[in-house]
Amino acid sequence: VHWSAEEKQLITGLWGKVNVADCGAEALARLLIVYPWTQRFFSSFGNLSSPTAILGNPMVRAHGKKVLTSFGDAVKNLDNIKNTFAQLSELHCDKLHVDPENFRLLGDILIIVLAAHFAKEFTPECQAAWQKLVRVVAHALARKYH
């Protein structure tokens, strides 16, 4: 994947302002609420019976932070995303059996969360760079499935 200097700047510039705990929790909660079938991968998280329960669930919050923290590894390794996510791809494929389509869904939700949090800064150019990034990350996570 080739990244222009502008794309790298748009991604890293915005990432430096992201509250990983809050945005990660919101992104995962939105995934579980908007796409309820994804809840089956989180049966150990306890009460996911309603949007209120999901939004208030500390395990959702903690895992959302973990997910977005690992997404930060992509931002730090833009030129080596495939290898950065090799182990996570293996885990999600071989042990967790997560449908790789869910990675794309989460990426799309992350875009929505970023747009909501950074409305003015999240220009069309910024969105284009981030859409590219979430596609590349989703592809890297789905790599072991092929």
Curated annotation (Swiss-Prot):
Q: Which domain of life is it from?
A: Eukaryota
Tell me which CDD domains the record gives. Hb-beta-like
Sorted keywords for this record are: Heme, Iron, Metal-binding, Oxygen transport, Transport
Q: Which Gene3D superfamilies match?
A: Globins
For this record, the Gene Ontology CC terms, alphabetical, are: blood microparticle; haptoglobin-hemoglobin complex; hemoglobin complex
Q: What is the protein's known function?
A: Involved in oxygen transport from the lung to the various peripheral tissues.
- Subunit structure, as described in the record: Heterotetramer of two alpha chains and two beta chains.
Q: What does the similarity note say?
A: Belongs to the globin family.
Protein known as: Hemoglobin subunit beta
**Species of the source:** Anser anser anser
* Gene it is expressed from: HBB
